[in-house]
């Protein structure tokens, strides 16, 4: 039995958080698993009782002085937590947390695996890109989600492993499950610029009026653009239901016929994986830089240009008007399910942990 500590900023409703919780829940059956997080608050996703969660001490950030002082305090609190955990391996998630862990681990012998969950281009501030470039060579291993990211990081990181996110539904849904589908089209994700939900709304406005009337269009997620998007729905004269953050997305997948992803940049979008298990047809933007890792266009899903609402509307009309074609796409997509099974991904992680421990 090993002691494994995960480190992450929060356990909110993001895809990286979902992946961490799924992996922690799988590993805790055979190992002692803990999660160290920077911020207070409960996990959005259900954790097994065996997983121990601790939050670093919280500090003030209300003035410039406190912002600066608190960052130093947070760093030393992280280092203390790492030392006291007496872990066999550390696994950190997301870029800024990775950088902090590399610095906080200096002098400690415990190996550190860092995990990237966005495309390398997503980190925009130059200072953070610089810190990533100079710090990442000091990790013991780096896991990435896309083939293009693996090529990029191998230029300066000694051990880079392509590890897909596990789908927590893989233990719940059998391969031959069938679902009672409704005329439902989904958008699931944060309501921010990168997820580009306005593209979804504009595409709906371009659909044939009969399709607009006969289908229900739903956005599950919340974020800074919600009010702006609600105004946009009114100005376009369309009907869209805003559900906010949804804990039980399974119920939506079971009913939905189509899922749309409109992002500019992604790592390995959770929604494109989860939808495989529920016979939901996937239409995705050709986001930078890994859409083709998950979708073979016109075979197991459909790809459209980034921010091209006209193309999205045409692809939507294609599958909404041709149920046989939609079913062909989802049946082909189901062949990918085995790639994301929890048991398979867990074993891949254990192999990587063994590598860094024995290095």
From Swiss-Prot:
GO biological process, one term: protein N-linked glycosylation via asparagine
Gene Ontology cellular component terms for the protein in this record: plasma membrane
Effect in UniProt of substituting residue 274 to A: Abolishes catalytic activity
Predominant place of localization: membrane
Binding-site positions, UDP-N-acetyl-alpha-D-galactosamine: 45, 117, 190, 195, 246, 266-274
Superkingdom of origin: Bacteria
Catalytic activity: N-acetyl-alpha-D-galactosaminyl-(1->4)-N-acetyl-alpha-D-galactosaminyl-(1->3)-N,N'-diacetyl-alpha-D-bacillosaminyl-tri-trans,heptacis-undecaprenyl diphosphate + 3 UDP-N-acetyl-alpha-D-galactosamine = [alpha-D-GalNAc-(1->4)]4-alpha-D-GalNAc-(1->3)-alpha-D-diNAcBac-tri-trans,hepta-cis-undecaprenyl diphosphate + 3 UDP + 3 H(+)
Documented EC number(s): 2.4.1.292
Pathway: Protein modification; protein glycosylation
One Gene Ontology molecular-function label: hexosyltransferase activity
Record: residues binding substrate: 17, 71-74, 190
Key words, A-Z: Cell inner membrane, Cell membrane, Glycosyltransferase, Membrane, Transferase
Membrane topology: Peripheral membrane protein
Consequence of substituting residue 71 to A: 6-fold decrease in the turnover rate. Slightly accumulates the tetra-LLO intermediate (Und-PP-BacGalNAc3). 1000-fold decrease in the turnover rate
Transferase in keyword set: yes
Domain statement: Contains an amphipathic helix (''ruler helix'') that has a dual role of facilitating membrane attachment and glycan counting. The ruler helix contains three positively charged side chains (Lys-67, Arg-71 and Lys-74) that can bind the pyrophosphate group of the LLO substrate and thus limit the addition of GalNAc units to three.
Protein name per UniProt: GalNAc-alpha-(1->4)-GalNAc-alpha-(1->3)-diNAcBac-PP-undecaprenol alpha-1,4-N-acetyl-D-galactosaminyltransferase
Organism lineage: Bacteria, Pseudomonadati, Campylobacterota, Epsilonproteobacteria, Campylobacterales
């Amino acid at each position: 039995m090993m002691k494994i500590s995960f480190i992450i900023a929060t356990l909110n409703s993001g895809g990286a958080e979902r992946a961490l919780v799924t992996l922690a829940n799988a590993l805790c059956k055979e190992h002692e698993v803990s999660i160290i997080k920077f911020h207070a608050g409960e996990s959005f996703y259900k954790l097994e009782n065996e997983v121990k969660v601790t939050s670093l001490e919280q500090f003030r950030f209300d003035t410039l002085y406190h912002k600066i002082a608190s960052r130093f305090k947070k760093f030393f609190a992280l280092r203390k937590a790492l030392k006291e955990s007496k872990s066999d391996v550390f696994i950190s998630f997301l870029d800024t947390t990775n950088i902090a862990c590399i610095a906080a681990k200096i002098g400690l012998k415990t190996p550190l695996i860092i995990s990237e969950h966005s495309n390398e281009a997503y980190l925009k501030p130059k200072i953070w890109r610089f810190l990533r470039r100079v710090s990442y060579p000091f990790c013991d291993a780096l896991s990435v989600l896309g083939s293009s990211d693996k090529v990029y990081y191998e230029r300066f990181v000694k051990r880079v492993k392509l590890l897909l996110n596990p789908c927590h539904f893989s233990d719940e849904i059998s391969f031959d499950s069938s679902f009672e589908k409704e005329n439902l089209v989904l958008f699931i994700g944060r309501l921010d610029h990168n997820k580009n939900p306005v593209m979804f709304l504009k595409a709906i406005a371009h659909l044939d009026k009969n399709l607009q009337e006969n289908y229900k269009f739903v956005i599950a997620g919340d974020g800074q653009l919600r009010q702006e998007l609600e105004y946009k729905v009114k100005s376009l004269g369309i009907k869209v239901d805003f559900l906010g953050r949804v804990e039980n997305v399974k119920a939506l997948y079971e009913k939905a016929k189509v899922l749309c992803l409109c992002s500019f940049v992604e790592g390995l979008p959770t929604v494109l994986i989860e939808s495989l298990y529920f016979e939901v047809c996937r239409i995705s933007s050709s986001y930078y830089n890994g859409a083709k890792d998950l979708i073979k266009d016109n075979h197991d899903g459909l790809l459209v240009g980034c921010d091209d609402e006209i193309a999205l509307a045409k692809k939507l009309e294609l599958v909404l008007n041709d149920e046989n074609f939609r079913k062909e796409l989802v049946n082909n997509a189901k062949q990918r399910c085995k790639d994301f099974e929890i048991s398979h991904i867990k074993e891949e992680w254990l192999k990587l942990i063994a590598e860094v421990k024995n290095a």
